[in-house]
């Protein structure tokens, strides 16, 4: 698992919070102080808390669990998509649709529609559709792909959710709480840690910081997968030896 260091966190600007006037008092225990009216996050707390989050992810994935990566703000989108894809995990990078988890049955129907439309589009030319009709089909598929592409291979509800910016993803937290799904989240000084099982106090605006968090969680996923694979191989060898 990637060992993130204090120096790397400083270089990525993890310690820079928001302007002091926007602070959330519930984050007081994670704030070191203020500089130029900007809150400074206490990295001596952030580092071990991030490591705890990584360990929780590794254990969960080693037990065949699924982690849903969520980050729909502009700075997070590409990074969330890249790192979740690298880890082979589902993601939401465009927009959180209300009921994405609490109304998963309906979402599954939309995913089925996406699959059907994609298949129809692949055979559209041979099926005699006009160029205009094919263009409309492409637009439909692109729209559905943007919203659901990251979760189309998700086999049911996730076992945990990794979130960048709890203020931006309030809908995600509400649904996770309703369903009892644990949340691992980056929480900046202007947001509340309520409803988050594994809090990672830190900057949620800098692309460098977001990359550091996502890479670290994706690495933990890959380590968990590797452990699960090794255990499966060991069990198969044991069974063969009997």
UniProtKB/Swiss-Prot annotation:
PROSITE patterns: RIBOSOMAL_S2_1. The lineage of its organism: Bacteria, Pseudomonadati, Pseudomonadota, Betaproteobacteria, Neisseriales. Disulfide bonds: none annotated. One of its GO terms (biological process) is translation. The keyword Ribonucleoprotein applies. Pfam families: Ribosomal_S2 (PF00318). GO terms for molecular function: structural constituent of ribosome. SUPFAM superfamilies: Ribosomal protein S2. One of its GO terms (cellular component) is cytosolic small ribosomal subunit. It comes from Neisseria meningitidis serogroup B (strain ATCC BAA-335 / MC58). This is Small ribosomal subunit protein uS2. PANTHER family: 30S RIBOSOMAL PROTEIN S2 PROKARYOTIC AND ORGANELLAR, SMALL RIBOSOMAL SUBUNIT PROTEIN US2M. Keywords: Ribonucleoprotein, Ribosomal protein. InterPro entries: Ribosomal_uS2, Ribosomal_uS2_bac/mit/plastid, Ribosomal_uS2_CS, Ribosomal_uS2_flav_dom_sf. Present in outer membrane vesicle formulations which are used as vaccines in human. Belongs to the universal ribosomal protein uS2 family.
